[in-house]
Design a protein with these regions (language model features):
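Glycine-rich phosphate-binding "P-loop"
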Residues: 172-198
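A short alpha->loop->secondary-structure connector
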Residues: 231-244
Length: 510
């Protein structure tokens, strides 16, 4: 079907077709909550805060119908709807949209919250790009850049679909897909792009070439490609590897404007702009003006203080609700290994510890296809890898575990507002994150405790549905867990009520 894969809300507990998170919660209880629904149009994906700007809708519909643009006031990448789509085309685009449906790799079922958090693993290794220049200049120890270069050099693919990371967002030529046919072109796109970009707006162009290719993009972009494969067989035929990062979110482009203003650099004066790289993590961001002036922030300051006086970093609502941040649908995911679980300021790193910051990553192969790619890159000497364990994901990226444990209750707080649906596998992992007491305890140990509320259980009882087995099971959790879930419910609801999930839909008339 080309129509939108709606979440199912009223299947019996033993139904294999269950797809909504509430159905797959503790004890797989039936939870008929029909006022929870996914967006039913591309426009509603945008208006309800579920869009993340991947560009697949423009790719499917064509630029005469939809164009991805950077739009004020936050300077986010969003579709501009120019003409009405035919029903079949709209259905196809909506079926692919990661703002409408989050999917999973089939045939794998986690048994614990930790397994669900790490995701499907064929192998997990720790290492870096063997080439010193790639390791230094690319982000995250050059892992993804190396894999992309290797796929072309080994002739496993003819080209790679990715983006040019080191670019200022006002450069329109870098706002969409970059198709690289040589390893040098892949290297030219190196570095993280911590801002809105539409890596899939040229996916149809890639498919039309009828040549094997790979995709390097964010987890939500990979989600879109997997969704699209269900309605277009060319994707599985031609796309030989889907590679991604561990994604914490990306900043609105208005944060770049704040950074430039703070350092008294105009857009027109920029000669070079880098989000990351030249160290791990390196300056974040870095700008060189045409007159030779250089400005840079420390990674910690930009992400957590957005340049201190510049104000808080802002990002889109879709990222706050993400349940795919570790690339659970990818063939290969590459993620930073932060020593002690946090990036540190450069001036806090002693000479004795400098080797820890040369750039290390965890590389997880999730599929046999991904395993073959990683193995061949290692055999070719392009990656230097050693053994690692799944628990290192939580130890080096605890912030992602905190996102996981709170995802279920944040989804529940949405009430009647449209929210991207979860397929059965995605729903199961979200339920495992919330309901596995051992996992929640490990997660809570990585951050500050939730505020103590004397009547937390009573408050949560008023919020949850009556008579549902999963809700009763949640209320029987330890008090510290109840306080944790209640705190996340209230925080999400507060943000919803102030309009964080509401956006304006742009048309040709705007």
């Amino acid at each position: 079907s080309l129509g939108h894969p709606q979440a199912i809300h009223s299947s019996p507990p033993d139904s294999p077709a269950m797809t909504d998170i509430e159905d797959l919660a503790c004890l797989a209880a039936k939870f008929d909550r029909s006022n929870t629904r996914a967006p039913t149009s591309l426009q509603e994906v945008v208006s309800s805060g579920n869009c993340m700007g991947c560009g697949i809708c423009e790719s499917i519909a064509g630029p005469e119908y939809i164009q991805m643009k950077v739009l004020p006031p936050k300077q986010r990448m969003r579709p501009v709807f120019l003409k009405a789509l035919e029903a079949e085309v709209h259905g196809k685009a909506l079926a692919a949209c990661p703002g409408a449906q989050v999917s999973s790799l089939p045939g794998w079922t986690p048994t614990t919250g930790m397994e669900a958090f790490v995701g499907k693993v064929m192998s997990i290794q720790r290492g870096y790009a063997s080439d010193p220049e790639t390791r230094f200049k690319a982000a995250a120890a050059g892992g993804l850049t190396t894999l992309g270069m290797h796929l072309i050099e080994s002739k496993q693919v003819d080209f790679v679909v990715h983006v040019k990371a080191c670019a200022l967002y006002s450069d329109e030529s870098t706002q969409g897909s970059k198709l690289s046919f040589t390893s040098a072109e892949v290297f030219d796109g190196r570095g993280s792009r911590y801002g809105p970009v539409a890596p899939l707006k040229s996916l149809e162009d890639a498919l039309s070439l009828k040549r094997p290719f790979a995709v390097v993009a964010k987890p939500c972009d990979i989600n879109a490609v997997r969704n699209y494969a269900k309605v277009d067989p060319r994707v599985d035929e031609l796309c030989k590897c889907l590679m991604t990062v561990s994604c914490g979110t990306y900043a609105d482009n208005v944060c770049v404007d704040k950074f430039l203003k703070q350092h008294e650099v105009e857009h027109s004066e920029v000669e070079e702009f880098r989000w990351r790289g030249h160290g791990c993590p390196g300056d974040t961001p870095y700008v060189k003006a045409k007159d030779g002036r250089v400005a840079a922030d420390d990674y910690v300051d930009f992400w957590f203080y957005n340049g201190k006086e510049a104000g808080p970093l802002t990002y889109q609502w879709r990222c706050k609700m993400c349940s795919d941040f570790l690339g659970y649908q990818s063939d290969v995911v590459v993620m930073d290994c932060w020593p002690n679980g946090l990036p540190e300021r450069r001036n806090a790193i002693t000479e004795e510890r400098k080797h820890e910051w040369d750039g290390w990553v965890l590389i997880i192969a999730r599929t046999q296809r991904g395993q073959d790619v990683v193995d061949s890159a290692k055999a070719a000497g392009m990656l230097t890898l050693g053994p690692a364990e799944g628990r290192e994901v939580l130890q080096t990226q605890p912030h992602q575990a905190r996102r996981a444990a709170s995802n279920f209750i944040r989804r529940y707080s949405h009430a009647s507002r449209p929210l991207m649906a979860l397929d059965e596998g995605a729903a199961l992992r979200v339920a495992k994150w919330a309901m596995d007491e051992d996992f929640v305890d490990e997660v809570m140990a990585t951050g500050p405790a939730a505020p103590v509320v004397a009547d937390a259980a009573e408050q949560l009882r008023e919020i949850l549905p009556k008579g549902e087995a999963w809700a009763e099971a949640m209320l029987k959790m330890p008090e510290r867990h109840i306080a944790y879930h209640l705190d996340n419910f209230k925080g999400t609801l507060k943000r919803l009520e102030r309009g964080d999930a509401t956006e304006t839909v742009s048309t040709s008339a705007d």
